């Protein structure tokens, strides 16, 4: 199935499901606070009430797209040390898998999931009516682009997409430094990118169209098309590995922290910025019928706090919190190597993603 087809199949299911979602709210114990009451709590004794409720609940189920050994387990260990009366269970999958799983569970009136994360998946289930707005005192520490205006999601970490290059094949001072420089005949047939919807060519196209404007952006992309960029369905990580192996000197759009990790391991690779850099956001959200709302709110507060964000930092993820730098500081916006980034928010990717995929398929794959 194509990247567009996969995306649409989930959306069609979500739309159909919206018709009945109002009737599929989970059961609550008589006299118990509603999920909304707990999620939106702002009283002075909020922390005390969350802890009291969480002790009765005892667990959380977290659906995640994050790498388990790199960051999920460290977050679990740090949180359970802070709150030893709560156990985190997690299920790891890609975005489509998590969305399908959650939709199927709600259709079956089985309410297992408490939290769901991803760059787009929370918005997908939000549009199906399956998320609960929530309040966290830590929202105040984040800029507008890193939190949902209605309170449906917060941010745990960031991804910055930049070119990566083989340091044995090309020197830093020879690299194309701007989008216009990519059109230099020298780079024809010398670049490679992934067809991945959320991190490859389509989102690169989205950056160009948004930063240059539709008319100028499409004119530019027509010229870029003539550069014969090699395309692969491989992940961005695999594209970078091919660059390290010498298949192409430049990987056009990869996660900069992947290049850093490989470089520190001794690989002949580095990254550099063409501004504005494409940025995507890992978000986390609360399920509408979470069976463990008190415990879930404690975990949401934890991952949004500076303390929780430092777990992401030590796991070589790029923390979303403005006051928590990356372990390698220059990987983040404002860390010294780039100063302009275009944030592709989950809503923006959801609303414009098909348009960018269509353009890529019609102009670069034919």
Question: How would you label these PLM feature ranges?
Answer:
Residues 1-57, 366:
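Short, low-complexity disordered leader/linker segments with a strong preference
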Residues 61-77, 88-106, 110-247:
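Extracytoplasmic ligand-binding site segments that recognize negatively charged/polar headgroups
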Residues 122-126, 249-268, 316:
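A ligand-binding cleft/hinge motif common to bilobed small-molecule-binding domains
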Residues 144, 158-161, 187-197, 220-226, 230-233, 303-326, ...:
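Periplasmic-binding protein-like
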Residues 162-169, 205-210, 280-293, 303, ...:
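A bilobed periplasmic-binding-protein/Venus flytrap-type ligand-binding module shared by bacterial periplasmic
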